[in-house]
């Protein structure tokens, strides 16, 4: 067994890409692994100069192979390097491909010991050395002139020489060529490190596990793997940059994963510098990751890109600049990816890293600074840690209803971490306080049924999510009591009864709950009476109670709130607080304030309204609907009686129909849908029965079963 100490000298012309550097000199030494005797003397170290004219790289490799086999014959050997591990693994194979020749097997897929890595392994087995290294690092950092370099310099040659007690003779500058000096130093460190390995732990871990590219490529080919390992990437590389880089070479990967920075010294969010896990890389300020391809053949072809450079724009620094890193691509496998899954994360979509306290608007997804109390785009109030109410996701509508009732009755916020833990998709939208910037939000209409008045209305209450599944946002938010919106996941989007139940509970807390079969459920009716009364006092300009015993104690108090914009149309009360600019428009369905450039509503996806009449565009509830019993509703008002028009419990002799806020105001179809008729449901109370387009009048009735909305109602809407 022999060690072949190999050091390469590289020449790089100025103003040329890094992947155009060339091997200029090759120096090597052969050491017997048992006796630690060097084959060549200090004054006769072999060196092969590669100048490109008289000596090409191909002829230099032939000479190197001949000299090695002349000394060791057929004996086993392994490469060792202190400064040239990167060039052996990356630069040498890349230049051989550029020159059009094939390296020998031990250089094409080398087994190499990196002495920096072996020294770190040896220090782990000797805790006293770790304390000594830490003291040295602290002393260096105390020196102001070298504090930055010392903090980033992980390859301290003086440290390894002093700890291993390597005796290096002082030589006059220029007396010995640099390549020989490097080779002599590497050989001395190897011999001294080998002598220091005295404990059983050292014998097991130090100088026993080289970087074995041959084993990696063999496992890659046998498994027909589609996964490659990427190393030496710029620290803030984004997924789009990687996709563009691979696309220019004609390949399209299907997935990217980056290795999280788990080094304690560089885990600070204010530190833009990332320490690479591999000490041999050319740029320590770099990251690594994995790339997945569609086929094994495509991944095999991409291995030829090993050693090519990639450009990245460092934007999150005081001096933005473009950096160039030479990318290392090595074969990998699914087994390696599975073992590393706990430290893997997707590459960022953007270079704009969120700062502590930044928050994403739950209404439009806009990223806001911490100091903003409302969304800069849509004026939606900022949530806070103590204000976010969450509920666990559940496919069973009865369980979802119980969770909603429990949350309303308790009046307290649940722990956001519990919701994120129980959410089937990890709930990235819930963790707005953890500085997680979600990807660009998309509104996936494929998850919704055919657009009907009911399904469209329910879509108004659904915020887009990364997983494509809607998050139902409660509409009883009001600036008066600083309650943040609730989030709830529900998979039963296609069940109209479930949607009605969710919508009505979120808006008015009607206790006549509906199960999946359309049957009424009167549970918890007494528990929510007080909440309904207080809730209607504080939020709504009308009072609705669907319990069998109607409570009208709060009717006279609601007229005072008619000018407070608490009707909660959509999610922003009377709409957005943003001032209207030229061209801005309000959605005719959900009254969302859209910018002029938007051709569809950002909230519900509805088309841009073409009506010029504000009264037809904005579905506001007339204040005459509310107030004392002597006030009569106007013709434009919508009346809903959840008690079947009965005057039971009334003491003033007036009809209930003119006093209750219409629930169906929030279910008005868009104008484009008022020109045709459609049939909804089959008369079993599970959906709307009839939609008539005569003067945009809507006749909602229930045949045979009146459990869909309390006791049923008839209503008409005028735009």
Swiss-Prot record:
CDD domains for the chain: RRM_ARP_like
Region of interest (Disordered), ranges: 389-415, 511-561, 622-661
Bias type Low complexity, positions: 392-415
Compartment list: Chromosome; Nucleus
GO molecular function terms noted in the UniProt entry: mRNA binding; zinc ion binding
Entry-annotated residues carrying Phosphoserine: 345, 455, 630
Ranges of compositional bias, category Basic and acidic residues: 652-661
Zinc finger annotations (RanBP2-type) as residue ranges: 355-384, 581-610
Main location per the UniProt record: nucleus
PANTHER family the record matches: RNA-BINDING PROTEIN INVOLVED IN HETEROCHROMATIN ASSEMBLY-RELATED (PTHR23111:SF40), ZINC FINGER PROTEIN (PTHR23111)
Protein name: Putative RNA-binding protein involved in heterochromatin assembly
Source organism: Saccharomyces cerevisiae (strain ATCC 204508 / S288c)
Gene name per UniProt: NRP1
């Amino acid at each position: 067994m022999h060690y072949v100490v190999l050091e390469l000298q590289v020449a790089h012309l100025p103003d040329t890409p890094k992947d155009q550097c060339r091997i200029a000199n090759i120096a090597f030494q052969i050491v017997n692994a048992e006796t630690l005797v060097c084959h060549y003397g200090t004054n006769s170290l072999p060196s092969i100069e590669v100048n490109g004219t008289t000596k090409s790289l191909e002829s230099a490799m032939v000479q190197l192979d001949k000299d090695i086999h002349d000394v060791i014959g057929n004996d086993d050997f392994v490469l060792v390097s202190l400064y040239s591990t990167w060039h052996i693994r990356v630069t040498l194979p890349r230049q051989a491909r550029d020159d059009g020749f094939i390296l020998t097997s031990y250089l094409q897929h080398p087994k190499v010991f990196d002495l920096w890595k072996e020294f770190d392994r040896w220090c782990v087995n000797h805790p006293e050395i770790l304390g000594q290294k830490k003291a040295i690092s602290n002393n260096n950092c105390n020196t102001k002139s070298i504090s930055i370099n010392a903090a980033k310099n992980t390859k301290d040659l003086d440290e390894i020489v002093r700890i291993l007690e390597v005796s290096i003779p002082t030589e006059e500058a220029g007396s010995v060529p640099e390549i020989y000096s490097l080779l002599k130093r590497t050989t001395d460190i190897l011999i001294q490190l080998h002598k220091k390995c005295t404990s059983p732990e050292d014998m097991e871990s130090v100088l026993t596990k080289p970087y074995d590219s041959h084993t990696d490529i063999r496992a890659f080919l046998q498994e027909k793997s589609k996964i490659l390992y990427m190393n030496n990437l710029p620290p803030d590389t984004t997924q789009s940059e990687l996709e563009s880089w691979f696309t220019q070479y004609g390949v399209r990967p299907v997935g990217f994963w980056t290795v999280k920075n788990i080094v304690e010294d560089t885990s600070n969010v204010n530190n833009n510098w990332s320490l690479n896990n591999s000490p041999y890389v050319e740029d320590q300020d770099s990251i690594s990751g994995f790339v997945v391809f569609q086929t094994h053949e495509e991944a095999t072809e991409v291995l030829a890109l090993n050693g090519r450079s990639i450009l990245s724009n460092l934007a999150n620094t005081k001096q933005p600049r473009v950096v160039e890193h030479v990318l290392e691509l090595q074969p990998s496998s699914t087994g390696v990816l599975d073992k590393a899954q706990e430290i893997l994360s997707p590459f960022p979509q953007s270079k704009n890293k969120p700062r502590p306290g930044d928050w994403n608007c739950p209404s439009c997804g806009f990223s806001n600074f911490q100091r903003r109390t409302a969304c800069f785009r849509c004026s939606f109030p900022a949530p806070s840690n103590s204000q976010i109410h969450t509920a666990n996701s559940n496919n069973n509508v009865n369980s979802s209803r119980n969770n909603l009732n429990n949350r309303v009755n308790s009046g307290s916020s649940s722990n956001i971490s519990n919701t994120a833990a129980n959410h089937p998709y990890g709930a990235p939208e819930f963790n707005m306080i953890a500085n997680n910037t979600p990807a660009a939000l998309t509104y996936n209409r494929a998850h919704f049924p055919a657009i009907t008045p009911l399904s469209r209305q329910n879509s108004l209450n659904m915020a887009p999510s990364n997983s494509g599944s809607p998050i139902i946002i409660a509409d009883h938010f009001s600036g008066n009591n600083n309650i943040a919106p609730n989030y709830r996941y529900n998979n039963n989007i296609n069940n109209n009864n479930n949607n009605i139940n969710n919508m009505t509970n979120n808006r008015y807390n009607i206790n006549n709950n509906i199960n999946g079969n359309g049957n009424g459920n009167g549970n918890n009716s007494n528990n929510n009476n007080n909440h309904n009364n207080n809730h209607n006092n504080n939020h709504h300009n009308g009072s609705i109670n669907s319990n069998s015993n109607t409570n009208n104690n709060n009717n006279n108090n609601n007229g005072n709130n008619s000018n407070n914009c608490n009707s909660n149309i959509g999610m922003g009360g009377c709409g957005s607080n943003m001032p209207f600019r030229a061209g801005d428009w309000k959605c005719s369905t959900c009254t969302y304030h859209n910018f002029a450039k938007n051709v569809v509503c950002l909230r519900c996806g509805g088309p841009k309204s073409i009506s010029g009449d504000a009264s037809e565009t904005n579905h506001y509830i007339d204040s005459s609907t509310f107030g004392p019993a002597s006030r009569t509703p106007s013709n434009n008002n919508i009346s809903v009686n959840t008690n079947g028009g009965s005057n039971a419990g009334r003491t003033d002799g007036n009809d209930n129909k003119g006093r209750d806020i219409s629930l169906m105001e929030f279910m008005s179809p868009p104008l484009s849908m008022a020109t045709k008729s459609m049939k909804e449901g089959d008369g079993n109370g599970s959906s709307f029965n009839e939609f008539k387009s005569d003067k945009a009048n809507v006749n909602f009735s229930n045949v045979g079963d009146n459990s869909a909305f309390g006791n049923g109602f008839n209503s008409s809407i005028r735009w």
